[in-house]
Amino acid sequence: MVKEAGTKNRREKTKRIIIGISGASGTIYGIRTVQFLNELGYEIHIIISKSAEKVAQKELGINLINELKKYSSYIYNQSQIEASPSSSSFSITSKGMIIIPCSIKTLAEIANGIGSNLLSRTALNFIRTNKRLVLVIRETPLGAIELENALKLARLGVYIMPASPAFYILPKNIDDMINFIVGKALDLLGIKHDIYKRWKG
């Protein structure tokens, strides 16, 4: 059970956050992010790709949509280009967006202004409205093209976050490593939490 740091019973006032789950390996990162945000009382809008559904089935043996329905009533396929998140007014009234995991294809589309689906279009809206956008990249190694795309977005204020777990937390299991990545992504949106053990020197 995750609780907001510094509180016992108070849940954070409900705010809207968009979570994108692309077809990169590491679907569990997206699911865990949604779980934590749900516990913190956020209104969560989730955009998923067809590839993400396949990856979830392969890596976790689950139906991704059925799993996400436990935590949110707002689930969109990236082909639903007409859905509410495609409007820039939606991003203006949202706290932020995290694409976790973010595939290299999705990174490239966003970096080059290609809003061919709901996921990339929504991300572009967050950039043009100067709202917080976090891209959690899991791919390795990264070549010059991927790094240039990431640099282009970083210069625009987008947070580029590699899914690189820390070992100073002395993880006891894979959940500790997953929670560290998710917690770091939430940090970038300014969300208070106690999901992982912070470095104290």
From Swiss-Prot:
Catalytic activity from the UniProt record: dimethylallyl phosphate + FMNH2 = prenylated FMNH2 + phosphate
InterPro entries xrefs: Flavin_trans-like, Flavoprotein, UbiX-like
UniProt cross-references to SUPFAM superfamilies, sorted A to Z: Homo-oligomeric flavin-containing Cys decarboxylases, HFCD
Tree of life domain: Archaea
Keywords on record: Flavoprotein, FMN, Prenyltransferase, Transferase
Enzyme Commission number, as recorded: 2.5.1.129
Positions annotated to bind FMN: G23, A24, S25, S49, S103, I104, K105, T106, R138
Gene3D superfamilies recorded: Flavin prenyltransferase-like
GO molecular function: carboxy-lyase activity; flavin prenyltransferase activity
Amino-acid positions noted as binding dimethylallyl phosphate in the UniProt annotation, renumbered to this chain: Y168, K184
Homology family: Belongs to the UbiX/PAD1 family.
Protein's name in the database: Flavin prenyltransferase UbiX
Lineage summary: Archaea, Thermoproteota, Thermoprotei, Sulfolobales, Sulfolobaceae
Gene: ubiX
